[in-house]
Structures are given as C-alpha cells and as structure tokens.
C-alpha cells in the first residue's frame, strides 16, 4: 500500500487527518496558534500527525519546501469563515474576502502539486464571492460512519455528530465526495449556536470542529484501492 502525505490547512484540531494517520499515512496540520481560533484544546495527537504552528500565506508552499515537508497527495483546508475583507474592514460592500483568497490559494497550491483538494466552509458569502460550491452536507448525514462512543467535546454535543450545520465543499483534482450515511441521531439544529454563547477562542473552536463522521467518510472515499 503506497503511503500518502496529507496537508490539512487552517486545521488546529487534527480531526480531518486522524483517519489517514491511523492507517499509516503522514499528516501535516497547519494552523497559527496566534490566529483567530487560538491553539486548540484537546487536539488530536498521533505519531503520524504533525501539528505545524505557522501562518498560511502566499508563500506557504515555498516555506513548506524549505522545512523539508513532503509534497502532498491530498490537501484539505478550513479557512476562517469570519467575513473580513482583505482591507481589514468588516465585510459589507467589499468583494474580496480573506476566506476566498485563502480558498483560491489552496486550489492553486494543489494544482501545482497535482494533488486532490477540498475546501470546507459553512454556508456564507464565499459562494457569492468565489463560485458555487460543488457539494453541500450537514454533519448528521455522515453519522453512520461513527460508532457512537466517540469523545464528546461538550455536554450539549450530540452523539454521532447528530446535528445540522449546512456546510459547503469546493473540491477538485479527483477528490471524491463520500456517500452520505446518516446516523441514528439528528437534533435538527446546530448545538454550537444554540448553547454556546460569547466569542471566546474556545467557543470558536467548538463551533468550527470538523464532523468526525465526515472526516472518516472522506478518508474511505479517497484513500485509494486496497487500503
């Protein structure tokens, strides 16, 4: 089985890459602990998951090469969904958002490496300022890939990631969107908005966590034959 290298950008939790690491693939999670979401509490640790604390900007690929980080076979990215214009002003009439620029950069990097790629972002203005998403999903729709005994990050977080949060996926390079397999739970709302108040880094982290069933489904659909 050929081992792959996975890059997961704007990823402080390590959730997306963990299934790959568990099957022997090497994962690099890039995230700036001084960024909007801070350093993630309870991030996923594994000998093959490498958390790299760095900012992701226009010379990101060159910096990775200088650090001798292997070229990726697949890239995942979760750009901050805060609608901030490139100018630094709150989004209103601006047409260039940081999240859109980051998403475009991910596509360019992936195409340069000939890698599969996927950008995930909640429903928002990225669709209007970049392009229509390739796919949509809610976390509960991939709950069937979970066993139900996974760690709960919060007392209000339902088992099987059984909640709604309409999420957009932009993808290319041969990325395969996995088949949906809903779990037995769907509370019909996003617990992170209903029960988490304030604007602390921990609240932002909990609201932005990658659904674990989706992460596993993506691995199964994109790992390649006989793996």
Describe the predicted segments one by one.
Residues 15, 36, 143:
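Flexible, glycine-rich phosphate/dinucleotide-binding loops
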Residues 2-6:
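Extreme N-terminal starter segment of soluble prokaryotic enzymes
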Residues 8-14:
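Class I SAM-dependent methyltransferase "Motif I" SAM/SAH-binding loop
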Residues 22-67, 134-135:
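Adenosine-cofactor binding site in Rossmann-like domains, unifying the SAM/SAH pocket
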Residues 1, 14, 226-227:
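Enriched but not universal
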Residues 9, 31, 63-74, 81-226:
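Class I S-adenosyl-L-methionine
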Residues 55, 59, 73, 79:
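Extended cationic-aromatic binding surfaces that line active-site or macromolecule-binding grooves
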Residues 19:
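Rossmann-fold NAD(P)-dependent oxidoreductase module
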């Amino acid at each position: 089985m050929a081992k792959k290298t996975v890059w997961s950008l704007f990823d402080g939790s390590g959730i997306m890459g963990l299934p790959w690491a568990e099957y022997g693939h090497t994962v690099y999670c890039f995230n700036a602990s001084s960024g909007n979401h801070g350093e993630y509490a309870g991030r996923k640790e594994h000998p093959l998951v490498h958390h790299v604390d760095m900012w992701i900007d226009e010379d990101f690929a060159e910096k990775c090469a200088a650090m001798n980080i292997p070229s990726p076979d697949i890239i995942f990215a979760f750009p901050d969904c805060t609608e901030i214009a490139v100018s630094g002003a709150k989004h209103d009439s601006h047409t260039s958002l940081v999240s859109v620029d980051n998403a475009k950069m991910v596509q360019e990097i992936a195409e340069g490496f000939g890698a599969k790629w996927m950008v995930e972002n909640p429903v928002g203005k990225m669709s209007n300022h970049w392009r229509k998403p390739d796919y949509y999903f809610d976390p509960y729709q991939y709950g069937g890939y979970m066993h139900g005994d996974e760690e709960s990050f919060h007392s209000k977080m339902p088992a099987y990631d059984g909640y709604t949060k309409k999420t957009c996926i932009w993808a290319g390079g041969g990325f395969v969107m996995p088949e949906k397999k809903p779990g037995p739970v769907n509370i019909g709302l996003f617990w992170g908005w209903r029960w988490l108040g304030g604007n602390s880094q921990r609240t932002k982290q909990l609201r932005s966590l990658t659904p674990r069933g989706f992460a596993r489904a993506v691995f199964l659909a994109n790992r390649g034959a006989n793996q």
